[in-house]
Amino acid sequence: SIFVSYLTSYDGVKIIARKDRNINEPVDLKQKMIGIVPGTISQILLDSFLSYNKIFIKELKLKHYKGSELPNALVNGEVDAISIWEPYAYFAQKRLRDLALKIPTYRVYRTSINMAVMNDFAAKNPILLQKVIKALIKAVDFMKNEKSQAQNLIAEILDIDINLVEEFWKDVKFTIGLDQLLIITMENEIRWAIEHGIVSSPVIPNYLDFINYEILEQVKPEAVTLIREAK
C-alpha cells in the first residue's frame, strides 16, 4: 500500500517540439510525427493533452521509442515532437537549444512520487514507517529552506549536472501528503489502460484499499485529505 507521497508535478512529463517544423501551439501538432513511449505516462500525457485541446489522435502520426531514445529522435529530426519525462526532456531541450519549444500542457496530468510497502510489513512495523515519514518531512523542509545546498547535494550524490537539478526544481512541488487527486489519477490511469487493452480486467479497483493513510494520520493528520468514511 502507498503510505505517503512526497513530490508532485504537473510538468514532470513534457511535450517538446522542434520550432523549425512550424510548431508554435498545440494545433500545429496535427499531421506531425510524435515520438512516444507506448503504454507509459508518455502516452497518457499526450492523450490527455490532445483531449484537452480537442485534437483527435488520428490527426497525428505516432512513432514508438524507448524513453532514452527520444532525445536523439527529436534532435536527429526523426520526429517533430516528443512526449517524455525527465531527464530526457531536459536533454532534448539542451541539445536543440533555440530550436526547442516546450508546449504548455495546461496541468492536464499530475505525476507523484510515492512510498509503498507490503501490507503485512506495514501492519508489523507502523512505528518504523512513522519514522520514515518524519525523516521525509525533515528532508522536504531542508529542500525548501536550504534550496541551493540541497540542489548541490543532489547533483553531487547523483553525479548529474546542477542545471538539470535546478530545472527539475522548477517543475516539482515537494510536499508530504495523501490527497484525493492521487486516487483520481490512478482511476484515470486504469481507465486509460483498459481502453488501450493494456490490462484485461474491465474492473476499476477501489484505490482507497491500496492506500494506508493511517500511518500518515499519526504523524501529520492535516496532510491526509483523502475522501474516506468517518470513523
Enumerate the language-model features and the residues they cover.
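Conserved C-terminal helix/tail region of periplasmic/extracytoplasmic solute-binding proteins
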Residues: 194-231
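Well-formed, non-transmembrane alpha-helical positions, independent of function
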Residues: 28, 72-73, 91, 168, ...
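Secondary-structure end/capping motifs
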Residues: 124-202
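Short, glycine-/small- and polar/acidic-enriched structural segments
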Residues: 1-56, 61-66, 80-86, 100-105, ...
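Pocket-lining segment of extracytoplasmic ligand-binding domains
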Residues: 21, 63, 68-157
